[in-house]
Amino acid sequence: MATLILLPEMKRTILFSFIVIAALLSGHAAAESVRVACVGNSITYGVGTENPVAESYPAQLQALLGPAYEVGNFGHSGATLLRRGHRPYMSLPEFGRALRFGADIVVIHLGVNDTDPRDWPDFRDDFIPDYLALIDSFRQARPGCRVLVCRLTPIGPRHARFESGTRDWRDSIQQCIATVARAAQAELVDLEAPLYAYPHLLPDALHPSREGAGRLARTVYGAITGRYGGLRMPAVYADSMVLQRDSAITLRGWADAGARIRVSIGGQRHHTQAARNGCWQLTLRPLKAGRDYTLRITDGQRTLTYRGVAAGEVWLCSGQSNMAFRLRQAATAAADVPQARQPDIRLFNMQPRWETTAAAWSAEALDSVNALRYYDSAGWQTCTPRSAADFSAVAYYFGQMLHDSLQVPVGLICNAVGGSPAEAWVDRRTLEHEFPAILRLWTQNDFIQPWVRARARQNMGTSAQPLQRHPYEPCYLFEAGVAPLERFPVRGVIWYQGESNAHNMEAHERLFRLLLQSWRQYWGNDSLPFFYAQLSSLNRPSWPWFRDSQRRLMTDLPACGMAVTSDVGDSLDVHPRQKRPVGRRLARWALNRVYGRALTPGGPLVKQAEARGRKVRLSFDYAEGLTTSDGQPLRTFEVAGPDGVFYPAQAVVRHDAVVVESPQVESPCSVRYGWQPFTRANLVNAAGLPASTFRVAVRATGR
């Protein structure tokens, strides 16, 4: 083979030629780069970051997109979309520069400043036409340009005008923006979602920090490129999972935009396409109860295969420490744990990575909590003595009774967190609109129990983040422990919580209603069954009132049931060890109300009190076979007259009613029962189920 020998002069000539060609190609590439104009206000400009030039969302977007794109930041602080607003964007220099930029892609995020009382009340009717005019301006300047219209970033409750107009006007603007996107045939990009569950990334309740701007940049990057990391599913989808039987099942996941998704299970085959935002969903036909299904999901590039899938009954088990209380800690653990080998019961145990013990958390813990990485899970596990021992005792006993009665697979998801208050489990939008006061300065907020606030401050003690997150913070556990389930189909919920709200019965009544509203909206089921354990007996003065409040809530709210636990309490320990009766009493409610089984769901539930002279006749639901739990006379009944002073009363069973009277009360006006923090009340029905603490007004019927 001939060898080519290059002389030094020839080498220099060739090298120079390569340099010239490379430079020309580089210039050509630069000329052909895709131009992205980021149009907006101070949020686009980068207010809230230390260095907007490098840390604003357009700057971070440039780094993500790389040299094939040229991103321009055309944000101006205080800019309004409204042309008659206090600072119209279309009258600012940035608007002209953005037009001259000749963008191939225009990303518009305007409307936050239009919530100003100088703007929205007077000029709201101009918003849609003004927005359409802005879009037309860019399309005229660059025909064929791609327009991305952005939903507004959050404005938090700490904003000075949040309740006086900003919250509601922002909601109206969001609706208008969706209308604009449809009318203009523009793409709608959600810039609320990446920040909404991360209020610490909005230090002034409005402007994102560098990390928050990074979340916006990644969202816009996905919208521009359609790349979302390929096919993914929520963590709750795993081998050995249980899917809800006999109901249409909607699967939800993520993939790159436009990806063709194919799903197969049990002879069914379905397909759909991922939307522009990377989300996809499809609905399976109802599955019959069974085992050993295989679920396959593919986008053509990656296939997810879930084996050992069962179809059966799925329940979410939630609340605070008495739901988190482990089977190995229960009074009957020695007998029950070795018997817990039940392959048709499957457990999804969402355990906190850091317990809320009386200690300061590490920097790693604080950072993870801020990122909503609070739970850990080993996936779905079949029920064995080992897996059951560390699972919720109440949930285990509930699931065991369901399985024994129904003879179908049972899936239990437990996300309970010790010490957690009800407000931590309600979604942010619900609290913002229905109870915003509880969101402000939560570690100093009297709506929140002093112990809860003190423990949170102790855990967060070493944090330098002024808005450090914590599991007890309002909304946190919904965002970290419910939302990640991505509406995984469940038959219902069992709940054991209230100890951390017993200081304020009235606030809890609001919160409990909002909790049910929140979860039922989330799962799209207005009648989602919700069965809860009443607080037990404990020497805390407010608990009789709280237990009675829980009783009244059950009678007011649809698709609810309450398991009375006052007979299995511990006078000195907020964590009574008798959990088997609690789980089984909750299961009775489910078996009766959800599955139509003919068994008494609960203990005697007072209906009314009628006076005849000194005597009061109390009637009850679930009253068949009224008796006492210990064979002793009825006790803890009290009667009050017009003065409101209660006196001990004698009580006897008459058929399916109880008759009470007190020699000190001539004209009874009210009766109460079990009205001691730690009560030894003993009224039960034929099923051995105890009556709830109650206080009831007396209706006079004559003498």
Residue ranges and their predicted role:
Residues 229-257, 309-317, 324, 589, ...:
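Non-catalytic, glycine-rich low-complexity segments
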Residues 16-24:
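Bacterial N-terminal signal peptides
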Residues 274-276, 324, 335-336, 341, ...:
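Catalytic-domain carbohydrate-binding cleft regions of carbohydrate-active enzymes
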Residues 252-335:
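Extended acidic/polar, glycine-enriched regions
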Residues 33-38, 43-132, 168, 287, ...:
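Conserved SGNH/GDSL esterase-like catalytic core that processes O-acyl groups on lipids
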Residues 27-31:
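Boundary at the C-terminal end of the N-terminal hydrophobic targeting segment
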Residues 63, 89-227, 474-565, 570-604:
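Alpha-helical cap/lid subdomain in secreted, periplasmic
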